[in-house]
Amino acid sequence: RQMCIRDSYQPEGIWVGDIMPYGKEGQFYVYHQRDTRNPGPFGEPFGWALATTKDFVDYKDYGESLKRGTDEEADQFIYAGSVFETEAGFHAFYTGYNREFLKAGKTSQTLLHATSKDGITWEKSKEALEIPPQEGYDKRNWRDPFVLWDEEREEYLLILGARKGEDKRKQTGRLVHFTSKDLKKWEFKGDFWAPGIYTMFEMPEIFKMGDWWYLVFSEYSDGNKIHYRRSKNLYGPWEAPFDDAFDGKAYYAGRTAFDGERRVLFGWVPTRIDNDDKNAYLWGGTFVPHEVFQKEDGTLGVKPVDQMMDCLLYTSPSPRDPKTS
C-alpha cells in the first residue's frame, strides 16, 4: 500500500517565507519567498519564487519568477505584496527592500510594480510607485501592499501595513490606503484602520464572501497569529468575532486566494533557533494551507484541504494487523 506524506510544502534546502497567492480556473499560483538560511534568515537576497498546484499534493516548480534586483537597486530583496489580474494581464505590487539603503539612512522599503502576460515571466516598471511613506509615518515600516478593485466606487484600493511614528514600543500599527483609477497615479487617503492594538500589521488583505467583507492581517508580535475582522461595508466599521484567529500561535503571514471554487489560506509555520522548541521562532519555515469556509453567522472557519487529507490516508487500505493495531 502507498501513503502520502505531503501535508505541507517546503523545497529541499529552502525555508518558505511570505506567500502571495493567486487563484484562477482551479489552479493556484503560489508566489513565495525562499530563504536559504545562509548564514541565517535574510542572509541571501531573494525574489519571488513560483510553484503552481491544483490539489496541494503535487506542485510544479518554476524557480524564481519575479527576480530580485542588484545590491544597488531598491529591490535587493523582494518583500511581500500581492498579485491580481486585469484584462491586460497580471500585476504584482510589491515591497522592495535594500539593507544597504537602511545602513545609509535612506528609505529602505519602496513600493514597486511589475506586469506579466502569463504570471510566470515578469517585467518590472522602471520607476517606483508614487506611494512613499507619508509624513508622520515610520519610513522603515511601510510594506506589504494589497490591491483590489472597488466596484462601487469604480477605482482601485491599495492598503498596506504602516506605523505612526518611529517608537517600536507603541501600539501605533495601522493600515493606510491609497486609491487609483489607472494603477499608475495613486492618491493617499489616510488611515484605513487604526485600532491601536499592535505595533505593526503585516500582510493585510480584503475579500468578500457572501454579504460580508473580511479584513485579514498578521499581528507583528510574539504571538505570530493571523487574524480577521468583518464588516458589511468595504470601509468598515470592522468588528472582531469572538474567535478572530484562523489558527494558533506560530501560523503567520497568511493571505488567501480563490480559484473559482474554494478559498484557501496560505501561511507558514516557523522553525526555531537550533530546532529547539525552547528557543525563539525564526522567520520563515514550512508552508501549510487551510481551506476557508463561512459559517451561518458570517464568521469564518478553516479546515484541511480535502485533496491533501485524502492523500494523507492510505490509498490502498488493508485490514488492521492485530499485532500492530
Language model features by range: what are they?
Residues 49-53, 110-118, 174-181, 227-233, ...:
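Beta-propeller blade signature
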Residues 1-7, 314-320:
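Conserved small/polar residues in nucleotide/adenosyl-binding loops
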Residues 202, 252-254:
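Repeated scaffold domains used in trafficking and secretory/extracellular systems
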